[in-house]
Amino acid sequence: MNHLRAEGPASVLAIGTANPENILIQDEFPDYYFRVTKSEHMTQLKEKFRKICDKSMIRKRNCFLNEEHLKQNPRLVEHEMQTLDARQDMLVVEVPKLGKDACAKAIKEWGQPKSKITHLIFTSASTTDMPGADYHCAKLLGLSPSVKRVMMYQLGCYGGGTVLRIAKDIAENNKGARVLAVCCDIMACLFRGPSDSDLELLVGQAIFGDGAAAVIVGAEPDESVGERPIFELVSTGQTILPNSEGTIGGHIREAGLIFDLHKDVPMLISNNIEKCLIEAFTPIGISDWNSIFWITHPGGKAILDKVEEKLDLKKEKFVDSRHVLSEHGNMSSSTVLFVMDELRKRSLEEGKSTTGDGFEWGVLFGFGPGLTVERVVVRSVPIKY
């Protein structure tokens, strides 16, 4: 049966990203948020929220949900109103559409006919429906009805690493497979008005944005038709951090998605990340974490700061993660793929020798509910100028 398996490692062959057109400027968001939620009388809470926004290091975010939507669905702005139906009515339509936009860009960069796509993986924490966003995205793209689909719900911020892990396994175990993997989250699922007793809600309102990212993954790139690897996916791993239960979570309730984020998350990640690195890179003989490039999910400024400090990383290691956080906020599962896209584009623009900022080896990290850590050892490819 070995003839059915690919001979080489899977690679990312193309990347596409998409965001809604509506933009939220972070400096203006506290005034906007308390106005549209009819909460301007909560002056002390508004000042707390302004400080959270100021410390976020986010400049702007994209958001599907605009003021017109809120006028049409006024109950969405109330703190715990039963609005799940109204939210899902929007999201079951908009999540596949935004995912399709990212996929179309990836397919265009790939340069091959979409009939060559054999598998589709879709992940989202924004919506649950049957048939799922995978089905609707496939229909919107006009993919073959026999494309093999995988739909994953409620992974959250580590989902970008998960889709790469599964895409790698599929591509390497099915010769000729071309896997379209897409992450899409739209935060209309958790937008609601403020409450004095729910400061975690304010953090979520301050940092989350909407986005979709898609990659095409395959082994044995066919350079005769123009396929070119961007990054090789060398190995993958997933772990649940010790003593982390309940630190990151999300719960589907009648009011929508209720988000949990414990203040100890940055410390938990920074205290455990080196063990993950040692397990991943000991087989390669690497122990200097400044000698690799980093594709890190920017869950928030505090996480990046703590990891940087714990591992004594040079400031430039998280430049792409910080850029994506600044320009888009935390887009959940798709964010780390935005960082991957930013890294390869910046490497080209700055004349680096490889897609990994001039380095050969790198790591991709996603962090999310559990607290779950997803990691991928990545190998860059030389850039030909």
From Swiss-Prot:
Listed PROSITE patterns: CHALCONE_SYNTH (PS00441)
Protein biosynthesis recorded as keyword: no
Tissue localization of expression: Expressed in glandular trichomes.
Keywords from the named record: Acyltransferase, Cytoplasm, Transferase
Major localisation: cytoplasm
Gene Ontology terms: cellular component: cytoplasm
GO biological process: polyketide biosynthetic process
InterPro entries per UniProt: Chalcone/stilbene_synt_C, Chalcone/stilbene_synt_N, Chalcone/stilbene_synthase_AS, Polyketide_synthase_type-III, Thiolase-like
Cited SUPFAM superfamilies: Thiolase-like
UniProt superkingdom: Eukaryota
Pfam families (alphabetical): Chal_sti_synt_C, Chal_sti_synt_N
Ribonucleoprotein is among the record's keywords: no
Membership in a protein family: Belongs to the thiolase-like superfamily. Chalcone/stilbene synthases family.
Entry protein name: Polyketide synthase 4
Organism of derivation: Cannabis sativa (Hemp)
Taxonomy of the source species: Eukaryota, Viridiplantae, Streptophyta, Embryophyta, Tracheophyta
Recorded name of the encoding gene: PKSG4
